[in-house]
């Protein structure tokens, strides 16, 4: 239920909006100008939805930055992956049973808040990127293993109102949220308001890059929001992170985020909301910003926000959002003080400064994402050292998994294109992947396949063993699949120190694969380079990856692309029509169940995956 006070016409549109500035100024003149971006969005939803009797007290909490009282938060959407999202929907299906048994209408049990469920957590890379049929084989295995789950989820798509289901094989929840699902500014029932969401995954803040508050929550809290109840919260510490300087040539967004992760962990920003701003932030594309926002949980924070600005507008156009929606985002942000230029007087609990020009080529590891490892320090850190490669045997420190994976990096076209260019130069020079390396490429969006084909880089990646194995989380969430049995046995018999290199966001011991004793996070182009090197004992900046036809050593600098090369391909090959061609049909998919959908689920008594919740018995 929306309030009536402070509701006004949004100029240049047929929509209304809530004048949060006026509501704040009525309590304390001049206060709105000092509010951070996050506070302005939290205040808006209070003006729009809060009980009028509680509105003044709730807004005073935000104005005076009181953190000792709860206030209601009404997210606009719920986004779920298939693991926790499925659990929430099982609860709702059980509730339908209980209501039916009491003589009620089970069809009335539906999410009130729009809910989007994306199946992305269940695909394992059983077949690596060197298998030309890997995608089809991995998907077939996924469907076979998850038939019970997918049957239930498909029923939910048709049985419940207000739920969109994106079937398996279409991408990662966070990347689809960034590229399609978030409108940035909602327009419902004649009212424009900021998009916000909760998601059943810790990396839900990925879409903070668009200026959308998106928090990772557990399944129970997601259920609460689905059913229209507010999520009660206290005002967090809101910390400004001023980005200054300009990144050095050859530095990727991955290098930047790994350096920022180390920096912010040292600054102790646990549970804080971060707002990145300054000339450095303004220079970053949304792809770069998303790489940073995605690793918010690795910072220890709850949100990693960027302001709405021209980069936001450019990205919405690039990803095929409708012109009317793009215009609404700009108009609303400028009218309500959410545009970057309107936040120059914002006051924060703390302001931290990070210089982008200080970033060098980085990895993270072993074992922790905040354990930054400059590639220039591999020898001094004891990672790179003397090693020998005996014919027919794996070396010490063998890289057994090299995975271009995760929405952290595959939602950033510059990172993906850089990997393709490294592959192309490596192929031209005759370099090959080491045979013990299980390589894979799992983009978080089908759009990546289109622009890589358009640029001619997908065949280059495939030649090195980085063919597309799926559009899902895969190796990043531990679904790296089985190793070749001979390789696995050699690791066991020789007690080898074996490793994984991936473009993901977490590398805790044992997470990536039981036989990868440690794992390292790296940019997609570095992942390709390590597949060629084949061991972490290799000094990636200094050692020779191979020799050319004249016998000259080939090092990383010989295959690393320039920024100009990367940008030229991104500008020529990433197009709005690609996003439209992927997403327009995706959101119209209905899975044929072969029968008329009933309001009650027909529980499978022998299922070990999906069972009727026992706590509704006698409810």
Question: What is the role of each PLM region?
Answer:
Residues 1-619:
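Fe-S-dependent hydro-lyases/dehydratases of central metabolism
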């Amino acid at each position: 239920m929306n309030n009536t006070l402070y509701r006004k016409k949004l100029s240049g549109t047929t929509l209304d909006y809530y004048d949060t500035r006026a509501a704040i100024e009525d309590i304390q003149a001049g206060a709105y100008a000092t509010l951070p971006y996050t506070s302005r969005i939290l205040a808006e939803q209070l003006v729009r939805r809060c009980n009028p009797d509680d509105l003044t007290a709730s807004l005073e909490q935000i104005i005076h930055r009181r953190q000792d009282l709860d206030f209601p938060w009404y997210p606009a959407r719920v986004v779920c992956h298939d693991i926790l999202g499925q659990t929430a929907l099982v609860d709702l299906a059980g509730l339908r049973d209980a209501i039916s048994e009491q003589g009620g209408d089970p069809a009335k049990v539906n999410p009130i808040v729009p809910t989007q469920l994306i199946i992305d957590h269940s695909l394992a890379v059983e077949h690596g990127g060197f298998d030309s049929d890997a995608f089809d084989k991995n998907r077939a295995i996924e469907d076979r293993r998850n038939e019970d789950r997918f049957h239930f989820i498909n029923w939910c798509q048709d049985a419940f109102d207000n739920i969109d289901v994106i079937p398996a094989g279409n991408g990662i929840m966070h990347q689809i949220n960034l590229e399609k699902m978030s409108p940035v500014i909602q327009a419902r029932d004649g009212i424009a308001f900021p998009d916000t969401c909760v998601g059943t995954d810790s990396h839900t803040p990925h879409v903070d890059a668009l200026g959308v508050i998106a928090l990772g929550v557990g399944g129970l809290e997601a259920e609460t929001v689905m059913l229209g109840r507010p999520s009660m919260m206290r005002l967090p510490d809101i910390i400004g992170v001023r980005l200054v300087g300009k990144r050095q040539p050859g530095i990727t967004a991955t290098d930047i985020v790994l350096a920022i992760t180390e920096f912010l962990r040292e600054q102790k920003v646990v549970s804080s909301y971060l707002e990145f701003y300054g000339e450095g932030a303004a220079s970053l594309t949304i792809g770069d910003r998303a790489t940073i926002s995605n690793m918010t949980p690795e910072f220890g924070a709850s949100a990693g926000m960027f302001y709405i600005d021209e980069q936001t507008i450019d990205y919405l156009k690039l990803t095929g959002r409708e012109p009317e929606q793009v215009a609404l985002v700009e108009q609303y942000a400028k009218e309500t003080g959410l545009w970057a230029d309107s936040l120059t007087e914002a006051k924060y609990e703390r302001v931290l400064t990070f210089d982008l020009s200080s970033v060098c080529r980085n990895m993270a590891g072993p074992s922790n994402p905040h354990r930054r490892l400059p590639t220039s320090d591999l020898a001094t850190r004891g990672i790179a050292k003397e090693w020998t490669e005996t014919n027919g045997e794996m070396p010490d420190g063998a890289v057994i998994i090299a995975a271009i994976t995760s929405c952290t990096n595959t939602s950033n076209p510059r990172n993906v294109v850089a990997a393709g260019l490294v592959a192309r130069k490596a192929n031209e020079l005759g370099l090959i992947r080491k045979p013990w390396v299980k390589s894979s490429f799992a983009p978080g969006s089908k759009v990546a396949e289109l622009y890589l084909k358009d640029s001619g880089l997908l065949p280059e990646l495939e030649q090195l063993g980085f063919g597309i194995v799926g559009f899902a989380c895969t190796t990043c969430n531990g679904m790296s699949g089985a190793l070749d049995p001979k390789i696995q046995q050699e690791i066991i018999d020789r007690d080898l120190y074996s490793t994984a290199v991936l473009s993901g966001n977490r590398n805790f011991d044992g997470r990536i694969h039981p036989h990868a004793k440690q794992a390292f996070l790296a940019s997609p182009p570095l992942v390709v380079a390590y597949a060629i090197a084949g061991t972490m004992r290799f000094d990636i900046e200094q050692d020779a990856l191979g020799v050319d036809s004249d016998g000259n050593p080939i090092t990383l600098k010989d295959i690393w692309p320039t920024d100009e090369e990367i940008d030229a391909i991104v500008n020529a090959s990433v197009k709005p029509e690609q996003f439209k061609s992927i997403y327009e049909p995706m959101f119209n998919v209905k899975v044929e169940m072969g029968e008329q959908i009933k309001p009650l689920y027909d529980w499978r008594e022998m299922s070990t995956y999906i069972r009727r919740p026992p706590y509704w018995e006698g409810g």
